[in-house]
Amino acid sequence: MSDWLPHSLPERVDINGLTFVPLTPALVEPDYAAVKRDIPMLRAWSGDDWPTEKFPIESNLEDLVRHDREQTERVALTYSVLLDAMVQGCIYVQPLLESFDERELENLSAAADVGDIVVRGWLHDRPAIDLIAACMSWLGNEPFEFSRLWWQTNANCTDQLAACEELRLRRVLSVRGDDQTWEMRA
């Protein structure tokens, strides 16, 4: 599904004190510093053992090259989140039904529409509600025309779940993975 994005994507978005810029290889060093800053939080967020304690900057560069390619090919949106011009987080945006493997989709496809979009992300130094509210506001308006936005999280990210409740994102889709259950909120 390559037609889910507007023709022109913003190079910078400032909203609620957060700055979003495309996640590109040019940001490898500041992104790496943000990733290495709180490994336990990112493992809880990612739902696996990423990043490892010995996660090398070369692997981070490979990730950024892949994310940049995904954005260029219109497979996903990937933005760094900056606070005071420093990388402090990331968001990942893609069509909901394309973000899970076929095994997981059996439970999802009946409850989700083809145009539904899922957003997930992490941020240091600000409450989760700030990131989620900014993303839902920005991506829920022009130039985007998504039928529905879902925020993806899991039980390990209690701050994100609480933020979803506070923002009244109470429609819930759950997808059981190998080790945990992913929860989407709209």
Show where each model-derived region lies.
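GNAT-family acyltransferases
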Residues: 1-125, 138, 142-186
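Glycine-rich phosphate-binding loop
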Residues: 126-131
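Conserved A3 ("GATE") glycine/threonine-rich loop of ANL adenylate-forming enzymes
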Residues: 134-135
